[in-house]
Amino acid sequence: MWPLRVYTRKKREGQRLNLTPTPDLGSPAKAEAPPGSKRKGKVHGLSKIAEKAERSRQGGSGSGPFSPRLGVTGEKSLQENRSSEDTQDEKIASLRESVTDDLQVDSSSSNSELVSGLSLHHGMASSLLSYSVTDSYAEYKSFEESFPSPELFRKSDYLDWECPNLEEHMQWKNSTLLDTSKAVAIEKAPQFSNVSAIFSTSSEDYQKCHRKTVMTVADQNVSPKAKCASNSESDNAACEILLAEKTCPSTPEKTKKKKTNSSTPGKKNRGLLTSTPSSETAGFVIDLSSVQKASFEELFPNVSNYVNSNEIVPVSSLQENSSNEFPANASEICCIIRTSPGTRQVKNKGVIVKKKKYSLPKDTPQDIIIKMA
């Protein structure tokens, strides 16, 4: 409840100011408040209440009680002021709500339009994509159904769709999918009556080559003997040469060329080396009875650090001291040994460097010399 403001006036003689009048249940007294601000309405209402109170006091008897109309009219005027203020506040709130609702409606409508536009674009794109995918899938399925197998045909005319005789091209498929109706079983295939006839020609050629090699060896006077069948002095050397023949077949060819007689022409030697296969030479034994067995010291005397050219000793020089003589036409064998050279003292030669003193030119004055120094 709003506090009741009462304006006091000077006391009159024989009268008493009633600050708290008692309510009267008689005829209601209305005090209308004009529309306007709060303060103006309150001041207007209070002034009217005070005037009515004075009139009632003057009109009434001095001994009787004051009329309670003043309190009732004051309360009603206050209630009306409050109701008017409430209505104004409600109007302002309703106006604000309407403005915010309009703004929200506008923003929501614009957003809905944007969303609807985006959804329309997205829907159109997705529909176009789905339509293209379905078309391509249908074309692919129709292409697969037109051919029974995914493999290509051998002829290049299979892409010619205007060709009416497409069934003719179905006959030429890949080798993996050939028609098995024309296939022949392996059991019914024609077989060779004599398979050995195929291999007989190759075996005969091999025997002819073998005979030729034997004849060439016989012409060169190489006697095929048993292994290690030489004299007692050259047993070890013969065994070593036979082992070398088994491991590396190219070395005995060179030894045969050197040990054979020099009277035979060179063409026969070349024919022997080229015609005889390496696998056949391992079965032959070279007669090494005429080869001298010499010690390492006799062959290579005075070998300490390195070998000079004067120390290379030919085998023919040892022919006088040996008991077994070489044949007259035997070729000389020279042996050269490569060893690491010994350490040699290297003399350090001193290099003399001539130093010249720097001398200034004669034309330079003395003060410049001092600055430079």
From Swiss-Prot:
Oligomeric and partner information: Interacts with CENPC. Interacts with PLK1; required for recruitment of PLK1 at kinetochores.
Function: Key regulator of kinetochore function during meiosis I: required both for mono-orientation of kinetochores on sister chromosomes and protection of centromeric cohesin from separase-mediated cleavage. Acts by facilitating kinetochore mono-orientation during meiosis I, when kinetochores on sister chromosomes face the same direction and are thus captured and pulled by spindle fibers from the same pole. Also required to prevent cleavage of cohesin at centromeres during meiosis I, possibly by acting as a regulator of the shugoshin-dependent protection pathway.
Any single GO CC term annotated in Swiss-Prot or TrEMBL for this entry: kinetochore
Subcellular location(s) of the protein: Chromosome, Centromere; Chromosome, Centromere, Kinetochore
UniProt region (Required for localization to kinetochores), positions on chain: 332-335
This protein's name: Meiosis-specific kinetochore protein
Main subcellular location of this protein, as a coarse class: nucleus
Stretches with biased composition (Basic and acidic residues): 77-91
InterPro entries (UniProt xref): Meikin
Keywords: Centromere, Chromosome, Chromosome partition, Kinetochore, Meiosis
Species whose genome carries this gene: Homo sapiens (Human)
Gene Ontology terms describing biological process: female meiosis chromosome segregation; homologous chromosome segregation; male meiosis chromosome segregation; meiotic sister chromatid cohesion involved in meiosis I; meiotic sister chromatid cohesion, centromeric
Record motif POLO box domain (PBD)-binding, residues: 275-277
Region (Disordered): 1-91, 250-276
Region forming the signal peptide: none
